[in-house]
């Protein structure tokens, strides 16, 4: 089963809280993790294969995830391949700017 964490904060960035939440909902069968945040004008996304700590281990992996609204996702594969293109949250700007995890 996948894990999803969403946070809205009136006055501050949410990426650290989403990261901490993803750590809590992950399990050993997980193959990918990602976070998307919204700063009021732009969507910021980072997603990689691996457990949460592996997906965000590179310096700066979370530094660009600014914004007071965000969603995080850990993927437990039941279909598809072991590829970063399967990692979520998914983002599209057509026809509307939206990011989602399921």
Positions of the model-derived regions?
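N-terminal glutamine amidotransferase
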Residues: 1-102
């Amino acid at each position: 089963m996948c894990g999803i964490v969403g946070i809205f904060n009136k006055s501050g960035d949410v990426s650290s809280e989403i990261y901490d939440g993803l750590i809590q909902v992950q399990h050993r069968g997980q193959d990918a993790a990602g976070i998307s945040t919204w700063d009021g004008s732009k969507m910021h996304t980072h997603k990689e294969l691996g457990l949460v700590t592996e997906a965000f281990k590179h310096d700066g992996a979370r530094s660009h995830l600014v914004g007071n609204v965000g969603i995080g996702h850990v993927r437990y594969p039941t279909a598809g391949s072991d590829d970063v293109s399967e990692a979520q949250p998914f983002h599209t700007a057509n026809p509307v700017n939206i990011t989602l995890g399921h």
